[in-house]
């Protein structure tokens, strides 16, 4: 198999006509969630690699198999230099929120909110208002949960989205706010966010900064800069 990318969470390979995502940790529920979310999105006409199967070696490894698509990588610079591409991203995120999902899904409250609070703890400023706001949000629509440009790409000029690891029931507007929170606010001339979504973008940029500090990522300076651009005066 050909290694495509590697992270702390997983390794991705190409195996002929298939894309293989091997989780580095034994978390069956995570594999199950990603498979279900990917398959559901695909069924709703979202352009995403088709889920094939999950290979399980008990207590050892989990491998999710998808069809391989020759996706062209994208960067934030690509989006900022192409207003049509930015519009395409927004349209895709709006379409994601229309996906029907299990209304009894508690992943937002049982995992994501707790993870956000933990990431706030790595920041050297008071984040209580951020935490209170996050806890006040009501999960009501399907969300991808990690909508950065690095989980998107182009296939024949059509936008592809993948890595539905956090696919779940979440707050309306979350995916759009998340995507915008990965970009310096000053670089976006038309970001089409409501006041509530702007508030979410500010908080998400703080979460992403805390996450970078937690993981000691090289992106800490740029994420700090992005947070400062979204921070309310």
Regions found by a protein language model. Give the residues of each.
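ATP-binding glycine-rich loop module of kinase domains
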Residues: 6-32
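The N-lobe alphaC helix and its flanking beta3-alphaC-beta4 segment of protein kinase-like domains
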Residues: 27-44
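Helix-rich C-terminal or lid/interface subdomains of diverse kinases
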Residues: 29, 87, 178-233
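Short pocket-lining segment of the protein kinase catalytic domain that shapes the ATP-binding cleft
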Residues: 38, 64-72
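Conserved kinase catalytic-core helix
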Residues: 44-45, 70-109, 125-134
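Short beta-strand micro-motifs within the conserved protein kinase catalytic domain, predominantly
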Residues: 50-62
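An alpha-helical support segment within catalytic cores of ATP-dependent transferases
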Residues: 98-145, 150, 155
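Active-site Asp-x-Gly
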Residues: 141-142, 155-193
